[in-house]
Regions:
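Conserved ATP-dependent adenylate/AMP-binding module captured primarily in the ANL superfamily
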Residues: 2-5, 45-76, 146-163
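ANL superfamily adenylate-forming
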Residues: 67-117
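Conserved pre-ATP/AMP-binding loop-to-beta segment of ANL
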Residues: 103-125, 131-132, 155-162
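Structural detector for helix-capping/boundary residues
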Residues: 6, 12, 48, 99-100, ...
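Conserved AMP-binding A3 loop
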Residues: 121-148
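Internal alpha/beta domain cores that form substrate/cofactor-binding pockets in large enzymes
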Residues: 15, 32, 38-42, 46, ...
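Short acidic/polar active-site loop segments enriched in Thr and Asp
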Residues: 9, 60, 83
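Conserved AMP-binding/adenylate-forming
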Residues: 2-45, 161-167
Length: 167
């Protein structure tokens, strides 16, 4: 709810640029819960390709570490669609709250908003290994179907838990 109180809205594309780990996973699920659409780009594809992907995806928001915000400041043309910024860590001279400020403004009893099967869920970029990287728009229905297939294939029963993650 802190993200929504910071100005993000359901359906907003939000670029997530934090190192993979607990914070990355937590923030991705927080964006899903807020109804925002995470934009996930592999930084290993190189600066030029990453900047092209950012420009192509036209995110309205960014949640990122200070280095990514510094790059945003130095290459504004790739980030011109950004209206809302959240810094994970120490904030320098750019606008927007820190993640700690967003957390303090949130409600602990926030309920997830309803999403429809055909609504945008995430934009995931291909690696670019066979040509230019391309953003693939996933819907909630696509993710739900993937979950159903995994549940059936691996025999995951009600009450059991599993957490598949990115490789």
């Amino acid at each position: 709810s802190g993200l929504l109180q910071s100005g993000m809205k359901k359906g907003d594309r939000v670029l997530l640029m934090v190192p993979y780990g607990t914070k990355f996973v937590t923030l991705a699920f927080a964006l899903f819960k807020a109804g925002a659409v995470p934009v996930l780009i592999d930084p290993g594809m190189g600066k030029k390709n990453v900047l092209h992907c950012i420009k192509q995806s036209e995110p309205r928001g960014i949640i990122a570490i200070p280095l990514a915000h510094a790059i945003k400041t130095l290459t504004p043309s790739a980030f011109k669609s950004i209206q809302l910024s959240v810094t994970v860590g120490r904030k320098w001279f750019w606008s927007g709250p820190t993640l700690d400020q967003v957390k303090r403004n949130g409600q602990t009893d926030y309920q997830m908003g309803e999403t429809l099967e055909d609504e945008s869920a995430a934009v995931l970029f291909t690696s670019g290994s066979t040509g230019p990287a391309k953003g693939v728009l996933y819907t909630h229905g696509m993710f739900n179907q993937q979950t159903r297939v995994l549940r059936e294939h691996f025999g995951i029963l009600p009450g059991k838990k599993d957490l598949p993650t990115f490789p």
